[in-house]
Amino acid sequence: MKFMKIGTKPDTFYTQEASRILITDTPNDLVIRINNTTYHLHRSCLVPKCGLLRRLCTDLEESDTVTIELNDIPGGADAFELCAKFCYDITINLSAHNLVNALCASKFLRMSDSVDKGNLLPKLEAFFHSCILQGWKDSIVTLQSTTKLPEWCENLGIVRKCIDSIVEKILTPTSEVSWSHTYTRPGYAKRQHHSVPRDWWTEDISDLDLDLFRCVITAARSTFTLPPQLIGEALHVYTCRWLPYFKSNSHSGFSVKENEAALERHRRLVNTVVNMIPADKGSVSEGFLLRLVSIASYVRASLTTKTELIRKSSLQLEEATLEDLLLPSHSSSHLHRYDTDLVATVLESFLMLWRRQSSAHLSSNNTQLLHSIRKVAKLIDSYLQAVAQDVHMPVSKFVSLSEAVPDIARQSHDRLYKAINIFLKVHPEISKEEKKRLCRSLDCQKLSAQVRAHAVKNERMPLRTVVQALFFDQESGSKGASSRSESQELFTRGKETPTDEHSMMHKLHLGPASTGKAKNVLEEGCKRGEEKTRSSTDPKKIVWKGTGSEHKHHISRDR
């Protein structure tokens, strides 16, 4: 930081009650009142250097004590005292922290060269241009200090000059950056660096007021020099700096009762940041967008802001990670941990866009679209596995999200099966009908042999799902060409998987002996409501007699 020292005499001001008095043998003849502070001074020192005081004291006798109120002086009593000390040649230290107040106050008092040669105002202006604007952090600190005197600083051009200086340095090639800057990314300090990172400037400007930050970013973008990703990184750093719960996945962050003033500040920040996000896809990460959507709901951001965030999030949903989706629910009416409604809304927007693109593109371009939706389907199934572990997760929300994924998106149902199994394990109290609803979207034909074998033995699964798994297990185990051909014919014509016991018996071509046993299994399961029917230590063997071959399936039921 740059400093300027003016004056040679020691500070002899002292405070007595609400007055500031100078230690001197000369009686005071000038009283300056600024709000609740009174200064007892001398006309002979201040009037020659202050054009305003000279004009106010012109018609007064020299022997009279003059009292003047300067309640409107910019910077208040502190700024006036700096100017007064200069008039007494008392040492004052100026830096980016107090320069703006001193500049505005000296301008108010008309302490120019035309009033007295070598006056304070030209000295301050020279320091501002030759030192402050040449420094990186000095320019930022000075710009931030203009928030206390916005009109004065605008009229004096301080704001514009500081912004121009900051933007010029942001656009400087990293190989030429030699000034001190703040960069505290995790692990950065431990690595050896041969060059300055491209986003070296983002942390320092995050100290700025929101409006000033917006002005700097807007000015930088107007040069069309910075890539969108750098703008996005600056927005991310700023949001993390001013939203205390943005970086945390803790669910306690949303439970803190904030006052309306804090909510309004955060609401304004979210609205402003969203409007500044570059239109270029990938300018900000999907995780950043999803967390903004969550916070936008919490702070009650405008509908326009939330709609735009959901649209942007859906464009990049395939880039999301599971951690990105695990956003806390901040609704006081819900007990479950995760905001599944938010994920469902973004997924719905993604699917609308995907269907629109699929119908518009030629078949040659559909490979990428298919890859995209399958990647999203895997992500959603992983998300379902995570939220299934929440004991308060309603069946309806789980089912709604699992069924939102189109059939074409899931090449395999192994992940979905795992999610359903976790849900059944964590929620053993759910009814038979709810179990059926959970498994409604599960296609046993798309289960791997290993997972299907697990499903056959899974006591938690509804009987219908177990029988379907048995059916497809037989189909996959059949070695005869005719059996494979028949199975292929059955499902390539769009027919549904047999779900009732009679059609299942028919499709499996059960012989008389095995039919009775299988039917007993079905009836027993229905009567007992999915209760355990076999001992794990004494597994029963059910022999399914197909056409020309026998297949033995051991069903082990744990009590």
From Swiss-Prot:
Which residues get modified to Phosphotyrosine?
417
Keyword annotations for this protein, in alphabetical order, are:
Phosphoprotein, Ubl conjugation pathway
Q: In which pathway does it act?
A: Protein modification; protein ubiquitination
Protein name listed in UniProt: BTB/POZ domain-containing protein At5g47800
* Species whose genome carries this gene: Arabidopsis thaliana (Mouse-ear cress)
**Highest taxon listed in the record's lineage:** Eukaryota
Gene3D superfamilies, A to Z: Potassium Channel Kv1.1, Chain A (3.30.710.10)
Please give the family membership noted in the entry: Belongs to the NPH3 family.
NPH3 domain residues are 199-476
